[in-house]
């Protein structure tokens, strides 16, 4: 999960400025629904910037939750062709809060139309038993990604990659 570390009030202020600049859609919504134009813009960006394996044959459609404010669509870049984060650098500095939030909104919107990541998950369980105590099972899982899918667009710098060792049953 990507976090910018902003407080909600600050985030809404930044989003309000992006909305007033015409860069994002209305931000006071919890809808996850995208318009047909937004889906097309996302899929166009994917086909122009990623391999064909990153674009599913059909659009990914998400329905709103029961209590969602369905009057508005999801927060997303505005327009029928999105301004890319790189294009936004002509008017906003890379370290500006507006740029950071816009990039998050752009990447999340586009990633919602990409194929899933694929990987191999390995789980190691260690059972500790002692006659004086009850048994305890420790478990750890790790995934080796074989295809990045949407993860090729959304990369969390804080996410650490650590491969689990190959162990056989009864290894100590």
Which residues are covered by each model-predicted region?
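Core catalytic DNA strand-manipulation module of type IA topoisomerases
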Residues: 1-172
């Amino acid at each position: 999960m990507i976090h910018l570390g902003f407080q909600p009030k600050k985030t809404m202020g930044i989003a309000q400025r992006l909305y007033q600049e015409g860069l994002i859609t209305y931000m006071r919504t919890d809808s996850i629904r995208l318009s047909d134009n937004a889906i097309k813009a996302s899929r166009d960006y994917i086909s122009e910037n990623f391999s064909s394996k990153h674009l599913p044959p059909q659009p990914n459609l998400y329905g709103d939750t029961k209590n969602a404010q369905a009057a508005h669509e999801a927060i997303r870049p505005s327009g029928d062709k999105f301004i890319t984060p790189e294009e936004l650098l002509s008017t906003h500095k890379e370290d500006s809060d507006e740029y950071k939030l816009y990039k998050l909104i752009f990447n999340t919107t586009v990633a919602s139309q990409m194929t899933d990541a694929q990987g191999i998950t390995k789980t190691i369980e260690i059972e500790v038993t002692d006659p004086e105590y009850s048994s305890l099972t420790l478990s750890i899982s790790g995934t080796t990604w074989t295809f990045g899918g949407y993860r090729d667009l959304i990369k969390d710098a804080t996410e650490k990659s650590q491969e689990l060792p190959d162990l056989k049953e009864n290894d100590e």
